[in-house]
């Protein structure tokens, strides 16, 4: 099955408002799936550091989007039923540009999401229905460690929690 067919099969059936986001108990499983998808499918992104950087960009987009919406607003970090993948990707890139402006101390001004529209669509769909801001703090910290532990462990094996994992 080609990517276009896969993308069509997985098109959302409805628009997602913030109130539709579901709490999740185990982010490790979801984040491991995202990391594994990157490692196995995203062309040109195979090093753990690059995978971690792109995933962090997307996670900041997701959290920022959730925090900036009221319960009745549509979330931007989600696919939409009548939207093609290029329109979707433009919306996610626009969201990341807002995130970069908000977090100048974390992201470089010239930093970009380096994922094709089709791959971006698949990855976003894995987490679009979940609320990351309503997850328990320790679950988020565990997920970050699971997701980017290999890329960002210090020489002694210590793990530095990212700013997003603290409230």
Question: Each predicted region: which residue ranges?
Answer:
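Charged, often flexible domain-edge or linker segments that flank or initiate folded functional domains
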Residues: 1-101
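Dynamic helix-loop-helix/coil hinge segments at AAA+ ATPase domain boundaries and subdomain interfaces
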Residues: 152-160
């Amino acid at each position: 099955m080609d990517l276009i067919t896969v993308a069509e099969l997985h098109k959302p059936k409805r628009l997602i408002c913030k109130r539709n986001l579901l709490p999740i108990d185990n982010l490790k499983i979801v984040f491991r799936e995202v990391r594994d998808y990157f490692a196995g499918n995203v062309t040109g992104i195979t090093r753990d550091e690059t995978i971690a950087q792109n995933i962090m960009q997307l996670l900041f987009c997701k959290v920022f989007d959730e925090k900036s919406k009221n319960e009745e607003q549509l979330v931007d970090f989600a696919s939409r039923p009548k939207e093609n993948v290029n329109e979707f990707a433009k919306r996610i890139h626009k969201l990341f540009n807002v995130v970069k402006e908000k977090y100048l101390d974390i992201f470089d001004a010239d930093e970009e999401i380096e994922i094709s529209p089709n791959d971006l669509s698949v990855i976003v769909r894995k987490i679009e229905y979940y609320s990351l801001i309503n997850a328990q703090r320790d679950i988020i910290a565990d997920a970050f460690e699971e997701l980017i532990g290999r890329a960002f462990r210090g020489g002694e094996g210590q793990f530095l929690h990212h700013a997003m994992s603290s409230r």
